[in-house]
Amino acid sequence: MKKLLTIFFAFCVASAIFAIGDQQRGGGNASSGLITVGVINNPPSESGYRTANDKDFKAVFTAANGYDASFAYSIVFEEQLVAFNQFVTNGVDYILLSAAATDGWDDAFRAAQRAGVKVFLFDRMVSAPSSLYEAAVVSDMAQEGKTAVNWLKDQRLGEYNVIHLQGVMGSDAQIGRTAALDAEFNSGAMKKVVQQTGNWSADEAKAIVQSVINAGTPFNVIYAENDDMAKGAVAALDAAGVTHGVGKDVVIMGFDCNKWALRELFAKNWNYDGQCSPFQASVVDGMIKGIQNGKAPAQKKIISEEKGFDARTITQADIDQYGLGE
Protein backbone atom coordinates (compact mmCIF):
# COMPACT_ATOMS: atom_id res chain seq x y z
CA MET A 1 0.00 0.00 0.00
CA LYS A 2 2.80 2.40 0.95
CA LYS A 3 4.51 1.69 -2.39
CA LEU A 4 1.30 2.49 -4.25
CA LEU A 5 0.94 5.75 -2.33
CA THR A 6 4.52 6.70 -3.16
CA ILE A 7 3.91 6.02 -6.84
CA PHE A 8 0.71 8.06 -6.73
CA PHE A 9 2.40 11.04 -5.09
CA ALA A 10 5.29 10.81 -7.52
CA PHE A 11 2.76 10.99 -10.33
CA CYS A 12 1.18 14.06 -8.71
CA VAL A 13 4.55 15.79 -8.50
CA ALA A 14 5.46 14.86 -12.06
CA SER A 15 2.08 16.02 -13.35
CA ALA A 16 2.46 19.34 -11.57
CA ILE A 17 5.97 19.79 -12.92
CA PHE A 18 4.98 19.06 -16.49
CA ALA A 19 2.06 21.46 -16.16
CA ILE A 20 4.28 24.33 -15.07
CA GLY A 21 5.78 25.01 -18.47
CA ASP A 22 8.47 27.55 -19.27
CA GLN A 23 8.31 30.68 -17.14
CA GLN A 24 10.48 33.74 -16.95
CA ARG A 25 12.09 35.08 -13.82
CA GLY A 26 12.31 38.62 -12.55
CA GLY A 27 9.23 40.46 -11.31
CA GLY A 28 6.58 38.23 -12.86
CA ASN A 29 5.51 36.45 -15.99
CA ALA A 30 6.83 38.62 -18.80
CA SER A 31 3.92 37.93 -21.13
CA SER A 32 1.09 38.32 -18.63
CA GLY A 33 2.51 40.62 -15.96
CA LEU A 34 1.64 38.03 -13.33
CA ILE A 35 3.91 37.00 -10.46
CA THR A 36 4.96 33.38 -10.98
CA VAL A 37 4.68 31.14 -7.94
CA GLY A 38 5.36 27.46 -7.34
CA VAL A 39 3.52 26.00 -4.35
CA ILE A 40 4.79 22.72 -2.87
CA ASN A 41 2.44 21.12 -0.37
CA ASN A 42 1.30 17.81 1.02
CA PRO A 43 -1.61 16.39 -1.00
CA PRO A 44 -5.12 17.58 -0.02
CA SER A 45 -6.13 13.95 0.54
CA GLU A 46 -3.68 13.71 3.46
CA SER A 47 -6.19 15.12 5.95
CA GLY A 48 -8.98 17.60 6.53
CA TYR A 49 -6.35 20.10 7.65
CA ARG A 50 -4.48 19.78 4.37
CA THR A 51 -7.67 20.08 2.33
CA ALA A 52 -8.37 23.41 4.04
CA ASN A 53 -4.75 24.52 3.64
CA ASP A 54 -4.69 23.75 -0.09
CA LYS A 55 -8.05 25.45 -0.59
CA ASP A 56 -6.74 28.56 1.18
CA PHE A 57 -3.70 28.84 -1.10
CA LYS A 58 -5.70 28.20 -4.26
CA ALA A 59 -8.18 30.90 -3.25
CA VAL A 60 -5.43 33.50 -2.72
CA PHE A 61 -2.86 32.72 -5.43
CA THR A 62 -5.04 33.36 -8.46
CA ALA A 63 -4.69 35.30 -11.70
CA ALA A 64 -7.28 37.76 -10.40
CA ASN A 65 -4.96 38.46 -7.48
CA GLY A 66 -1.92 38.89 -9.73
CA TYR A 67 -0.41 35.39 -9.73
CA ASP A 68 0.42 32.63 -12.15
CA ALA A 69 0.57 29.75 -9.65
CA SER A 70 1.47 26.09 -10.11
CA PHE A 71 1.01 23.42 -7.45
CA ALA A 72 2.95 20.22 -6.68
CA TYR A 73 2.03 17.68 -4.00
CA SER A 74 3.84 14.96 -2.07
CA ILE A 75 4.41 13.73 1.49
CA VAL A 76 7.81 12.38 0.40
CA PHE A 77 10.84 14.67 0.84
CA GLU A 78 12.66 13.42 -2.28
CA GLU A 79 9.63 14.09 -4.45
CA GLN A 80 9.16 17.55 -3.01
CA LEU A 81 12.84 18.23 -3.73
CA VAL A 82 12.35 17.25 -7.38
CA ALA A 83 9.44 19.69 -7.63
CA PHE A 84 11.44 22.43 -5.90
CA ASN A 85 14.39 22.07 -8.26
CA GLN A 86 12.09 22.06 -11.28
CA PHE A 87 10.42 25.27 -10.14
CA VAL A 88 13.89 26.83 -9.83
CA THR A 89 14.83 25.59 -13.31
CA ASN A 90 11.61 27.02 -14.72
CA GLY A 91 12.45 30.38 -13.18
CA VAL A 92 9.44 31.13 -11.02
CA ASP A 93 9.60 34.29 -8.94
CA TYR A 94 8.67 32.61 -5.66
CA ILE A 95 8.49 29.12 -4.19
CA LEU A 96 6.11 28.51 -1.28
CA LEU A 97 6.94 25.35 0.65
CA SER A 98 5.24 23.21 3.28
CA ALA A 99 8.11 20.81 3.82
CA ALA A 100 7.58 17.07 4.19
CA ALA A 101 10.82 16.89 6.21
CA THR A 102 12.70 19.47 8.25
CA ASP A 103 16.20 18.50 7.07
CA GLY A 104 17.91 18.38 3.68
CA TRP A 105 16.82 21.68 2.12
CA ASP A 106 19.98 23.77 2.48
CA ASP A 107 21.54 23.11 -0.93
CA ALA A 108 18.24 23.52 -2.77
CA PHE A 109 17.57 26.81 -1.01
CA ARG A 110 21.05 28.06 -1.90
CA ALA A 111 20.49 27.13 -5.55
CA ALA A 112 17.19 29.02 -5.51
CA GLN A 113 18.88 32.04 -3.96
CA ARG A 114 21.60 32.04 -6.64
CA ALA A 115 18.90 31.85 -9.31
CA GLY A 116 17.00 34.78 -7.83
CA VAL A 117 14.04 32.68 -6.70
CA LYS A 118 12.65 33.74 -3.33
CA VAL A 119 11.47 31.05 -0.91
CA PHE A 120 8.70 31.26 1.69
CA LEU A 121 7.87 28.57 4.23
CA PHE A 122 4.31 27.95 5.30
CA ASP A 123 2.73 25.60 7.84
CA ARG A 124 6.02 23.91 8.80
CA MET A 125 9.56 24.98 9.64
CA VAL A 126 12.79 23.53 8.27
CA SER A 127 16.28 23.32 9.78
CA ALA A 128 17.95 25.43 7.05
CA PRO A 129 19.44 28.81 8.07
CA SER A 130 16.87 31.60 8.00
CA SER A 131 19.12 33.58 5.64
CA LEU A 132 18.15 31.12 2.88
CA TYR A 133 14.44 32.01 2.84
CA GLU A 134 12.42 35.21 2.93
CA ALA A 135 10.07 34.39 5.81
CA ALA A 136 8.09 31.61 7.47
CA VAL A 137 4.37 31.67 8.30
CA VAL A 138 3.97 28.59 10.45
CA SER A 139 2.46 26.82 13.41
CA ASP A 140 4.51 26.28 16.56
CA MET A 141 4.33 22.50 16.53
CA ALA A 142 6.40 22.12 19.69
CA GLN A 143 3.99 24.40 21.56
CA GLU A 144 1.04 22.42 20.19
CA GLY A 145 2.59 19.32 21.74
CA LYS A 146 3.30 21.05 25.06
CA THR A 147 -0.25 22.41 25.27
CA ALA A 148 -1.69 18.96 24.62
CA VAL A 149 0.58 17.15 27.07
CA ASN A 150 0.00 19.76 29.78
CA TRP A 151 -3.74 19.22 29.32
CA LEU A 152 -3.21 15.47 29.65
CA LYS A 153 -1.17 15.87 32.84
CA ASP A 154 -3.92 18.07 34.27
CA GLN A 155 -6.36 15.15 33.97
CA ARG A 156 -4.49 13.52 36.88
CA LEU A 157 -5.15 9.97 35.76
CA GLY A 158 -4.08 7.24 38.15
CA GLU A 159 -1.73 5.95 35.47
CA TYR A 160 -0.84 6.92 31.93
CA ASN A 161 -0.54 4.00 29.51
CA VAL A 162 -0.29 5.73 26.15
CA ILE A 163 -0.68 4.59 22.56
CA HIS A 164 1.21 7.24 20.58
CA LEU A 165 0.27 7.52 16.90
CA GLN A 166 2.87 9.66 15.15
CA GLY A 167 2.60 11.56 11.88
CA VAL A 168 5.00 11.23 8.96
CA MET A 169 8.42 10.88 10.57
CA GLY A 170 10.76 13.84 10.21
CA SER A 171 8.03 16.38 9.50
CA ASP A 172 7.89 19.49 11.66
CA ALA A 173 4.42 18.54 12.89
CA GLN A 174 5.57 15.07 13.96
CA ILE A 175 8.74 16.32 15.64
CA GLY A 176 6.94 19.05 17.58
CA ARG A 177 3.94 17.01 18.70
CA THR A 178 6.16 14.07 19.66
CA ALA A 179 8.71 16.02 21.72
CA ALA A 180 6.50 16.91 24.68
CA LEU A 181 5.19 13.37 25.03
CA ASP A 182 8.67 11.90 24.72
CA ALA A 183 9.72 14.05 27.67
CA GLU A 184 7.02 12.40 29.78
CA PHE A 185 8.02 8.92 28.62
CA ASN A 186 11.68 9.63 29.38
CA SER A 187 10.88 10.93 32.87
CA GLY A 188 8.79 7.88 33.69
CA ALA A 189 5.65 9.94 34.29
CA MET A 190 3.88 8.17 31.44
CA LYS A 191 4.27 4.69 29.99
CA LYS A 192 4.78 4.18 26.26
CA VAL A 193 2.55 1.25 25.24
CA VAL A 194 3.42 1.73 21.58
CA GLN A 195 4.90 4.62 19.62
CA GLN A 196 4.53 4.18 15.89
CA THR A 197 3.89 6.28 12.81
CA GLY A 198 0.45 6.10 11.30
CA ASN A 199 1.53 8.43 8.45
CA TRP A 200 -1.50 10.67 9.12
CA SER A 201 -3.72 7.77 7.95
CA ALA A 202 -6.91 6.58 9.67
CA ASP A 203 -6.46 3.08 8.27
CA GLU A 204 -2.88 2.74 9.50
CA ALA A 205 -3.84 4.07 12.93
CA LYS A 206 -6.73 1.63 13.17
CA ALA A 207 -4.39 -1.28 12.41
CA ILE A 208 -1.90 -0.18 15.08
CA VAL A 209 -4.56 0.12 17.78
CA GLN A 210 -6.15 -3.16 16.74
CA SER A 211 -2.80 -4.92 17.18
CA VAL A 212 -2.48 -3.54 20.72
CA ILE A 213 -6.01 -4.67 21.56
CA ASN A 214 -5.31 -8.13 20.14
CA ALA A 215 -2.14 -8.38 22.25
CA GLY A 216 -4.11 -7.64 25.40
CA THR A 217 -1.79 -4.83 26.46
CA PRO A 218 -3.55 -2.37 28.80
CA PHE A 219 -3.84 1.28 27.72
CA ASN A 220 -5.97 4.25 28.69
CA VAL A 221 -4.76 7.11 26.45
CA ILE A 222 -4.52 7.46 22.67
CA TYR A 223 -2.44 10.46 21.60
CA ALA A 224 -2.88 10.81 17.84
CA GLU A 225 -0.93 13.52 16.02
CA ASN A 226 -3.84 14.34 13.73
CA ASP A 227 -7.61 13.94 13.68
CA ASP A 228 -7.65 11.29 10.98
CA MET A 229 -5.46 8.95 13.02
CA ALA A 230 -7.63 9.57 16.08
CA LYS A 231 -10.65 8.61 13.99
CA GLY A 232 -8.96 5.39 12.90
CA ALA A 233 -8.01 4.60 16.49
CA VAL A 234 -11.59 5.10 17.64
CA ALA A 235 -12.83 2.79 14.89
CA ALA A 236 -10.61 0.04 16.33
CA LEU A 237 -11.94 0.70 19.84
CA ASP A 238 -15.55 0.62 18.65
CA ALA A 239 -14.98 -2.67 16.83
CA ALA A 240 -13.60 -4.17 20.05
CA GLY A 241 -16.27 -2.71 22.31
CA VAL A 242 -13.82 -0.46 24.19
CA THR A 243 -15.40 2.75 25.47
CA HIS A 244 -13.77 6.13 24.91
CA GLY A 245 -14.23 9.80 25.70
CA VAL A 246 -15.27 11.67 28.82
CA GLY A 247 -15.62 9.33 31.80
CA LYS A 248 -14.90 6.25 29.66
CA ASP A 249 -12.08 3.71 29.40
CA VAL A 250 -9.78 5.54 26.96
CA VAL A 251 -8.86 9.21 26.61
CA ILE A 252 -8.81 10.29 22.93
CA MET A 253 -6.57 13.14 21.78
CA GLY A 254 -6.19 14.53 18.26
CA PHE A 255 -4.90 17.60 16.42
CA ASP A 256 -6.15 19.89 13.62
CA CYS A 257 -9.70 20.78 14.74
CA ASN A 258 -11.71 19.51 11.81
CA LYS A 259 -15.40 20.27 12.36
CA TRP A 260 -16.25 16.58 12.47
CA ALA A 261 -13.57 16.05 15.14
CA LEU A 262 -14.80 18.95 17.27
CA ARG A 263 -18.29 17.48 17.04
CA GLU A 264 -16.85 14.29 18.54
CA LEU A 265 -15.55 16.40 21.43
CA PHE A 266 -18.90 18.11 21.81
CA ALA A 267 -20.55 14.68 22.02
CA LYS A 268 -17.88 13.70 24.59
CA ASN A 269 -16.69 10.79 22.43
CA TRP A 270 -13.22 12.38 22.30
CA ASN A 271 -11.48 14.34 25.05
CA TYR A 272 -9.06 16.85 23.47
CA ASP A 273 -8.27 18.37 20.09
CA GLY A 274 -5.34 20.71 19.41
CA GLN A 275 -5.77 23.51 16.91
CA CYS A 276 -3.46 23.85 13.91
CA SER A 277 -4.37 26.79 11.70
CA PRO A 278 -4.19 26.14 7.92
CA PHE A 279 -4.70 29.77 6.95
CA GLN A 280 -1.32 31.21 5.97
CA ALA A 281 -1.92 32.22 2.35
CA SER A 282 -3.11 35.79 2.87
CA VAL A 283 -0.11 36.57 5.10
CA VAL A 284 2.33 35.20 2.51
CA ASP A 285 0.48 37.12 -0.21
CA GLY A 286 0.91 40.36 1.73
CA MET A 287 4.64 39.74 2.14
CA ILE A 288 5.11 39.00 -1.56
CA LYS A 289 3.22 42.14 -2.55
CA GLY A 290 5.48 44.08 -0.18
CA ILE A 291 8.62 42.62 -1.77
CA GLN A 292 7.29 43.50 -5.22
CA ASN A 293 7.03 47.09 -3.98
CA GLY A 294 10.53 47.10 -2.51
CA LYS A 295 9.57 46.35 1.10
CA ALA A 296 11.20 43.42 2.90
CA PRO A 297 9.08 41.35 5.32
CA ALA A 298 8.94 43.00 8.73
CA GLN A 299 9.17 39.62 10.48
CA LYS A 300 11.21 36.55 9.60
CA LYS A 301 8.85 34.18 11.39
CA ILE A 302 5.13 34.59 12.01
CA ILE A 303 3.50 32.02 14.27
CA SER A 304 -0.22 31.32 14.03
CA GLU A 305 -2.24 31.75 17.22
CA GLU A 306 -3.63 28.38 18.28
CA LYS A 307 -5.34 26.73 21.24
CA GLY A 308 -6.57 23.38 22.48
CA PHE A 309 -10.17 22.31 23.08
CA ASP A 310 -11.53 20.19 25.94
CA ALA A 311 -14.68 18.08 25.54
CA ARG A 312 -15.99 19.38 28.85
CA THR A 313 -15.89 23.04 27.83
CA ILE A 314 -16.19 23.18 24.02
CA THR A 315 -19.24 25.00 22.66
CA GLN A 316 -21.11 25.00 19.38
CA ALA A 317 -19.74 28.50 18.84
CA ASP A 318 -16.20 27.07 19.05
CA ILE A 319 -17.06 24.48 16.41
CA ASP A 320 -18.54 27.13 14.14
CA GLN A 321 -15.59 29.50 14.55
CA TYR A 322 -12.59 27.17 14.64
CA GLY A 323 -13.69 23.96 12.93
CA LEU A 324 -12.25 23.12 9.52
CA GLY A 325 -14.39 21.82 6.69
CA GLU A 326 -18.00 20.79 7.09
Please tell me what each predicted stretch does:
Residues 1-36, 110-115, 321-326:
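Short, low-complexity disordered leader/linker segments with a strong preference
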Residues 22, 33-35, 165, 169, ...:
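Hinge/cleft segment of the Venus flytrap/periplasmic-binding protein
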Residues 34-56, 60-82, 86, 98-103, ...:
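Extracytoplasmic "Venus flytrap"
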Residues 48-63, 67, 144-148, 172-190, ...:
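Short, solvent-exposed amphipathic alpha-helices that sit
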Residues 70-73, 128-151, 165-166, 195, ...:
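Short beta-strand elements at the ligand-binding edges of bilobed clamshell
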Residues 80, 136-162, 176, 204-206, ...:
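Hydrophobic alpha-helical segments within soluble ligand-binding/sensing domains
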Residues 81, 85-89, 97-114, 181, ...:
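Hydrophobic alpha-helical
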Residues 104-143, 161, 258-266:
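Flexible loop/hinge segments that line or gate small-molecule binding clefts
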